[in-house]
Design a protein with these regions (language model features):
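Conserved N-terminal Rossmann-fold NAD(P)-binding element of oxidoreductases
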Residues: 30-32, 55
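Glycine-rich phosphate-binding loop and adjoining beta1-alpha1-beta2 segment
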Residues: 49-92
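Glycine-rich phosphate/adenylate-binding loop
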Residues: 2, 115-119, 124, 129, ...
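N-terminal charged helix/coil linker that caps or initiates catalytic domains
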Residues: 1-29
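Hydrophobic/small residue at the entry helix of a nucleotide-binding pocket
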Residues: 36
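Acidic/polar active-site rim loop that often engages polyanionic ligands
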Residues: 63-70, 153-163
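Conserved SAM/SAH-binding loop
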Residues: 100-109
Length: 266
């Protein structure tokens, strides 16, 4: 047995030999290789997933170092998906890594998503892209889990999975929900579930203030500004990583459950 094979013995002993085969055969797409997506990709690789497709077009920036796995002083200005792919191959040389150096949009949505994925993990922060992907996957019965905003939070114990229609105190998920209802025909009944899982947090957000302090209230100066890396929510790796790990845990459980169900039906 090679060192690479030995590296995943623990995963097989956790899920069982038969279920682990399903994980090794799985093809999972990660959209957005950033504060959450890098941890998603890492967890998938260390779980022995057989094929991973990474979709992103960003380069590593110094402002990413606080929360992104690929962000090091030595990797600044390098292409994120390439840095992540090199890391995955060093973890699991047998993993097939596909790179799509693009941002998901109207012109490439079909090309990016119509690839026989077992699961799509939406870790991007574009509302437009998230809405398109959720709608596309739902109507084609492609399993997808979307991830809400991980900024402005300090308590990883508050991270959980709920139906996208039922998130609280998550501006990103709320905006996504609004777009899905207004542009994609999702139910406007506030009690109706979307049947799309969302990783989110119940923690009240910490907003940066112009004087350098932090408050639970959004200041007038912050309210009209774009919440980007330089002036938006602060973030820490132990929260963004938790979002990613919880998403991967659910995805692997779903893949294993589907495999077991199909085996029982034989």
């Amino acid at each position: 047995m090679t060192q690479a094979q030995q590296g995943f013995d623990g995963v097989e002993r956790l899920y069982g030999a038969d279920s682990y085969k399903a994980i090794r055969k799985a093809h999972i797409c990660v959209v957005g290789i950033g504060g959450v997506g890098t941890w998603v990709a890492e967890a998938l690789a260390r779980s022995g997933v057989g094929q991973i497709t990474l979709i992103d077009m960003d380069d590593v920036a110094a402002s990413n170092i606080n929360r992104q796995l690929v962000a090091l002083l030595s990797t600044v200005d390098q292409v994120k998906i390439e840095v992540m792919a090199d890391r995955i191959k060093d973890i699991n040389p047998s993993c097939q890594v596909n790179l799509i150096e693009e941002f998901v949009g109207e012109n490439n949505l079909e090309a990016c998503l119509n690839r026989d994925y077992d699961y799509v993990i939406d870790a991007c922060d574009s509302i437009k892209a998230k809405a398109m992907m959720v709608s596309w996957c739902k109507h084609r019965r492609v399993p997808i889990i979307t991830i809400g905003g991980a900024g402005g939070q300090r308590d990883p114990s508050k991270v959980k999975i709920v139906d996208l229609a039922m998130t609280k105190v998550d501006p990103l998920a709320a905006k996504l929900r609004s777009v899905l209802r207004s542009q994609y025909g999702f139910s406007k009944n506030l009690k109706s579930r979307f049947r799309i899982e969302c990783v989110c947090s119940s923690e009240q957000l910490h907003y940066p203030q112009p004087d350098g302090s932090v408050d639970w209230a959004k200041s007038a100066n912050v309210a009209g500004a774009k919440m980007d890396c330089s002036r938006g929510f602060g973030a820490v790796s132990f929260v963004t990583g938790t979002f990613g790990f919880i998403a991967v845990a659910r995805v692997l459980d779903k893949i294993v459950a589907k495999h077991q169900r199909l085996e029982n039906e034989k």
